[in-house]
Amino acid sequence: MKDNRPSWDEYFLDIAEKVSSRSTCLRLKVGCVLVAEDNRILATGYNGSPKGMEHCIDEGCLKNDQGRCIRTVHAEINAILSVDSHLRKNSVLYCTHEPCEHCTKSIIQAGIKKVVFKNPYPNDVNSFFSKYIDWVCFDNNKKKEL
């Protein structure tokens, strides 16, 4: 009998896609899922404003001199902040998009052992970090270890 179920990576990436629908960012909807070694979901996160602040979808983006929105907390950071540090150790982060270099540093600092994502970042800045953490891209539903 053939098992037609999605792999764990596909399963959690699909959940990350659904989580991204809660994003309040006008530019890009990002979702992520933080998963323990035994495949239990520890937390989810999406990009949006900090608690109590106005959302970009309501007030527009609050941009700095470089044109980047400073109101938004990234999905990865929202998930990491939702979990006690001892639970994050050796976990896997599934994300709709490749984490930026700032989130990547936080991911490594949090003790997360692996990142699996769908949409690559437009530059290869994270190639530097791939020697410190397992980095997997699902590009066109094909798994590529980086």
Where do the protein language model's features map onto the residues?
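Zinc-dependent deaminase catalytic domain
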Residues: M1-L146
